[in-house]
C-alpha cells in the first residue's frame, strides 16, 4: 500500500517535481530503516539542458530495477526531478544495501550517476526535505486553482490582484499578523469572525502576482510562513479574472 503525493517546488534554483510516499510519516519511526540511500542521475553531457529520449528511457529502467531489486531490503520514499537531475530516495536497515544499489547503477553507463548513503536515525531527508510543509502542501491546491482559471479562459501570465483569506485562533493572533503584513508586500483587507470554525478569527490580505505556479507558490508561501508562528492558516484564494485573448 502506498500514498504518493506529487507537488512542484524549487530545488537548487530550478523548478522541480517532488514525489513523496506519505504513508511513511507514521511508519518510519517504528521501522529500523535508518540508512538513507540516494541515487542521482543526470545527462552525460554536463551542458545538456534536459534528458534526451534515450536518457529518459534508461532512467526509467534504472528506477524500475532499483525499486524491484531492493524490495525487502529498502523502501522507496520519494524522488525529486528537475530538467537536468533526477534523484531517488530510499531507506534501508543496513548500509550494505548501498553495494547492491551501486551494482545496479553500474549497468547504466549512459547516465551520469551518483549513488551514496548516509546514516539518518531521525529520517531528516524524509521529514525535513521530501515531506511537504504547509507551504508546499498549498502548492497542490494552487495547481488545482490555476487549472480551473485556465479552463475558464484566464491569461495565467498576466499579473493581477490576488486576495488571500487567513484564519487564526484568536483576534490577538490575527492582529499581530496584520501588523506585519505591509512588510511582506501585502495590503490588509477586512476581518471577520467565523464562530463555527476551529480558527474563527479571519482576515484578508491582497497583493499582485501572475498565476504561474512558481509565482503563486512563492506568493502564498510568504503569507503561510508569516501566519504559522501565530497558528494561523491559509483558507482561501481569490484571484482577479484576466481574460486570455
Predicted features along the sequence, with ranges:
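Long, contiguous binding/interaction regions
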Residues: 1-245
Amino acid at each position: 500500500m502506498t500514498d504518493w503525493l506529487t507537488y512542484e517546488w524549487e530545488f537548487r534554483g530550478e523548478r522541480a517535481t517532488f514525489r513523496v510516499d506519505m504513508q511513511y510519516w507514521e511508519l518510519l519511526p517504528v521501522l529500523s530503516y535508518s540508512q538513507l540511500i540516494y541515487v542521482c542521475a543526470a545527462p552525460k553531457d554536463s551542458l545538456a539542458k534536459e534528458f534526451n529520449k534515450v536518457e529518459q528511457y534508461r532512467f526509467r529502467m534504472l528506477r524500475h530495477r532499483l525499486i524491484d531489486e531492493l524490495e525487502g531490503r529498502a523502501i522507496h520514499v520519494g524522488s525529486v526531478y528537475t530538467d537536468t537531475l533526477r534523484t531517488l530516495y530510499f531507506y534501508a536497515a543496513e548500509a550494505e544495501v548501498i553495494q547492491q544499489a551501486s551494482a545496479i547503477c553500474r549497468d547504466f553507463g549512459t547516465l551520469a550517476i551518483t549513488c551514496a548513503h548516509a546514516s539518518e536515525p531521525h529520517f531528516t531527508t524524509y521529514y525535513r526535505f521530501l515531506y511537504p510543509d504547509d507551504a508546499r502542501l498549498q502548492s497542490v491546491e494552487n495547481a488545482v486553482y490555476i487549472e480551473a482559471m485556465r479552463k475558464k479562459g484566464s491569461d495565467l501570465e498576466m499579473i493581477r490582484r490576488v486576495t488571500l483569506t487567513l484564519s487564526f485562533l484568536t483576534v490577538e493572533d490575527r492582529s499581530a499578523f496584520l501588523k506585519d503584513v505591509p512588510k511582506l508586500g501585502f495590503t490588509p483587507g477586512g476581518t471577520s469572525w467565523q464562530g463555527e470554525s476551529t480558527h474563527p478569527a479571519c482576515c484578508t490580505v491582497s497583493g499582485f502576482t501572475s498565476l504561474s505556479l512558481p509565482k503563486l507558490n512563492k506568493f502564498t508561501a510568504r503569507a503561510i510562513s508569516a501566519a504559522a508562528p501565530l497558528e494561523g492558516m491559509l483558507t482561501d484564494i481569490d484571484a482577479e479574472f484576466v481574460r486570455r485573448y
